[in-house]
Amino acid sequence: MADTEKNLVIFDTDPGIDDAMALLFLKAQPSLKLAAVTTVFGNAETEVTTRNALYLTQRFGIDVPVYAGATRPLTIERGPAPAFIHGEDGLGDVGATQSFAVRPAEGHAADRMVEIIKANPGRVTILAVAPLTNLALALDRDPGIASLVKDVVIMGGAFAWGGRRGNATPVAEANVHNDPHAADRVFTADWPVTAIGLDVTSHCVATHDDAAQLASGGEAGRFLWDISRGYEDLYRRRNQVDGCCLHDVAAAAYLVAPELFALRSGAVRVVTEGIAIGQSIQKLDGHIFGPSAWDGHSSKLVAGEADYAGIVEAYKTAIRSLG
Ligand code: BDR
Ligand code: CA
């Protein structure tokens, strides 16, 4: 497929073990072209997630500029990075990035996002698998981008479809919880948003055997195996699953296989204060209530369920294809 026919993707990310999985999944997709990787705080500080994005793109020959973005949430204080999930270095503390020092490309992630979208009207999908701060900043810098993007696909939120609630708190998913004001800004902007939240991603489990098979198949699978030993262990203890959740991969899979997802339409708001801070709530279209904070906001799509096995299979096929 010629590059001009491919879907252009800005990958906004906080690598992060499942972010690394998603980036390698994207590399394997012939119908997608990465226009930029933009980084933000989340699984580690921005300096670390940027270094990791640079390391991953260079090690796996992904030809794309990496732009560093926000280092803190819009309004609230930055909480501690979850080293117990992704390691101090964000990639499982196996020493992958030790002594790796390459500078990101010039410019702030939010500015570059705006430029790329304006230069390619109707062609760019933002795939955001991290706190939504860069997207909110981009909207503030130029609200006009809302009508120019093709789609905004997010790994974020937990909408209690199928009873699934939070992972950062009992009601809040981590990416939304890390910057609830940014998430509310992104969900209430007048642009298309599809959210693939914990409702779906927590059912997309690559088993220990899946990971072992991929590890014996080539460098990408071996690398993912190495960095995900502690991650898998955490999921085994915390979620009682024999493997780990492919959160960010599931959102990436939506770009190439949307038929795997069942979506619900309705306005989405995010709680920005109090004990439920970071909770994401969808008011389904057609449900009638009294006046509420959801009124006047355009509908967004939220994945309620999906073909979980199909998503895991797509991931395995992608990583295998990288050799
Ligand atoms: C999300 O939070 C991060 O820790 C993961 O990379 C994923 O994007 C899951 O809640
Ligand atoms: Ca992530």
Which residues does each predicted region cover?
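A residue-level signal for conserved active-site and pocket-lining positions in enzyme catalytic cores
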Residues: V66, V186, A252
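Short, surface-exposed amphipathic charged segments that create phosphate/polyanion-binding patches used
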Residues: P80-G87, G166-P170, A211
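Metal-dependent C-N hydrolase catalytic cores
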Residues: N7, T50-A119, H297-G310, K316-R320
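Conformational coupling and interaction surfaces
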Residues: A2-K6, F25-L26, K33-L34, A174-H177, ...
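Short, glycine/acidic-enriched capping/hinge loops at junctions between secondary-structure elements
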Residues: M21-L23, V48-T49, E77-G79, I281-K283, ...
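Short, well-ordered secondary-structure micro-motifs
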Residues: E77-G79, G163-R165, A206-H208
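Active-site histidine-anchored catalytic micro-motif
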Residues: D3-T13, I17-Y55, G95-T201
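Short secondary-structure boundary/hinge segments and terminal tails
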Residues: A44-E45, L74-E77, C204-V205
